[in-house]
C-alpha cells in the first residue's frame, strides 16, 4: 500500500482526493490545504473544500494548513510522514525544492500541457474557443507547470461553461491519478515541447467587464467566467444567462433591443445577436429578460443602455 500526501484546496481537488482515499491500493497519510478563509458579508471563517470533506468523512487523517511550505518544521513533518508520492491538485502554493526532493510529486493540471500553464487553464481554453481540453499528470519541478507529462485524458468542452468543465475535468482527473500512480514505474515521462508552451494568468474580477462589440467574444467570456466573476457592463448590469443567436449580423445598432420574447429578449451587438435570458442590476434581484424590460418600460428598437 503506497503512502500518499495530498495537497489541494477547491472542489476540483476534492474529487481527486476522494478517489485516492477510497482506493485500497493507497493510504492517505495527510492533507495539505490553504488556511481557512473569511467568507461572505459576515466574514465567517470557512475551511477549504478538501478540508471540509476530509474532516467530516475521515477525521483521523491529519490536516495541515501552513501559510508557507518553506517552514523547516513543515518540511520535517512531510519527511517524517515518509510518503511514496505527493499528489498536488489546485493547491495554490508553490512547492520548494526541499519538498520536491522528498518523493515523486505528481501534479494534476487542467489542460493538455504545454498549453495553458498557470492559474486559469480552463477559462483560457474557453476564451480561446477551444473545442477540446483535458487533464494531465505531470512530474513536478521548480518551474511553473514545466515538468514532464506522465499521462493525459482529453474531452470535448464546446459550449460548456467553466463550472461544467471544472466538474468534467475533476472526474477525469480522479480516474487519471489512479492510473498514473498504479502504473508509475512503467510510465515513460514525456518532456514538454517548450516551443508549444502558453501561459495563463490568474482571473480577476475586472476580467468580467464586457462591451457589446462582438457577440461571439461576449458569449465566450460568459462561458469562461461562469460562475465567477460573471459578466457585466460598465454600469454594473450583470448578464446571468444568455445564448448566442447569431455571430455575424451587423445591420442593427449596438445595444438595440431587437425582439421581445416570452421570458427573454434579443440584443444586438455591433457584430452578432444575443438572447438575454436573465440579468441583474447592481444591488437588486435577478430578473428574466422580459420582466427586466417591462420594469424599465423598454420595448423593441429601444437601446438597452
Swiss-Prot record:
It comes from the Bacteria. The keyword Protein biosynthesis applies. It catalyses: L-methionyl-tRNA(fMet) + (6R)-10-formyltetrahydrofolate = N-formyl-L-methionyl-tRNA(fMet) + (6S)-5,6,7,8-tetrahydrofolate + H(+). One of its GO terms (molecular function) is methionyl-tRNA formyltransferase activity. CDD domains: FMT_core_Met-tRNA-FMT_N, Met_tRNA_FMT_C. InterPro entries: Fmt, Formyl_trans_C, Formyl_transf_N, Formyl_transf_N_sf, Formyl_transferase-like_C_sf, GART_AS, Met-tRNA-FMT_C, Met-tRNA-FMT_N. It is an enzyme of class 2 (transferase). (6S)-5,6,7,8-tetrahydrofolate binds at residues 111-114. Keywords: Protein biosynthesis, Transferase. Belongs to the Fmt family. Attaches a formyl group to the free amino group of methionyl-tRNA(fMet). The formyl group appears to play a dual role in the initiator identity of N-formylmethionyl-tRNA by promoting its recognition by IF2 and preventing the misappropriation of this tRNA by the elongation apparatus. This is Methionyl-tRNA formyltransferase. It comes from Campylobacter jejuni subsp. jejuni serotype O:6 (strain 81116 / NCTC 11828). The lineage of its organism: Bacteria, Pseudomonadati, Campylobacterota, Epsilonproteobacteria, Campylobacterales. The gene is fmt.
